[in-house]
């Protein structure tokens, strides 16, 4: 029953994120791929031209939420993460593309967290890094607890999140997010 609540929470957050995120009408072709590389013990995932990431260990693609462009992954310990990439100028709050780097990341956090706080969730910034253009924050409530890293590089946005990770401490979740972003 507990896993059903977690799965429902994942679905709810994905739907809510996708309803908040408006990527505009102009279609952009992307190339999506990746694979597990046993010799390096990493799982690579990319959405070209928007971003790529190397995940430590073996991760299986689990679910994909197309309207949020969010790929979920699950590892052998049942830890669930999500990854989304996109252009910074396609977000509703940045249509003119004037927000860049850390200013964009802060506006993205404000926009996203405000939306969820209005729905009864709680949000807290855990760490900010203006020189590397990222914010790590936590969203929790209604039996749901997620850690996010929002980052921006050269007009490209990454949204990494750790959803179900009961076996990881808060410090491990934060370090995981930082490691995959800063590599």
Task: Identify the function of each model-found stretch.
Residues 2-5, 106, 110, 114-118, ...:
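Polar/charged alpha-helical tracts
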Residues 1-20:
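Sec-dependent bacterial lipoprotein signal peptides
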Residues 7, 39, 153-160:
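General secondary-structure edge motif
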Residues 18-78, 122, 142, 161-183:
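N-terminal targeting sequences that direct proteins away from the cytosol to non-cytosolic compartments
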Residues 12, 51-54, 152:
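Structural motif
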Residues 26, 65-158:
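Conserved polar/disulfide-associated segments of primarily extracytoplasmic proteins
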Residues 12-13, 81, 180:
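Enrichment for repetitive, rod-forming helical segments
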Residues 3, 55, 92-93, 104, ...:
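General structural signal for secondary-structure boundaries
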């Amino acid at each position: 029953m507990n896993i059903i609540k977690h799965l429902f929470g994942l679905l709810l957050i994905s739907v809510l994120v996708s309803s908040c995120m408006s990527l505009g009408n102009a279609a952009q072709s992307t190339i999506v791929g990746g694979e597990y590389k046993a010799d390096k013990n990493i799982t690579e995932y990319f959405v070209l031209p928007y971003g790529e990431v190397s995940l430590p260990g073996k991760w299986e693609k689990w679910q994909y939420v197309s309207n949020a462009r969010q790929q979920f992954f699950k590892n052998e310990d049942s830890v669930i993460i999500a990854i989304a990439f996109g252009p910074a100028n396609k977000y509703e709050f940045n249509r003119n593309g004037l927000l860049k780097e850390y200013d964009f990341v802060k506006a993205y956090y404000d926009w996203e967290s405000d939306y969820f706080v209005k729905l009864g969730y709680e949000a807290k910034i855990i760490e900010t890094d203006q020189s590397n253009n990222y914010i790590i924050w936590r969203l929790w409530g209604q039996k749901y607890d997620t850690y996010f890293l929002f980052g921006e590089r050269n007009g490209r946005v990454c949204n990494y999140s750790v959803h179900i990770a009961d076996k990881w401490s808060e410090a491990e979740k934060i370090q995981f997010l930082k490691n995959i972003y800063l590599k």
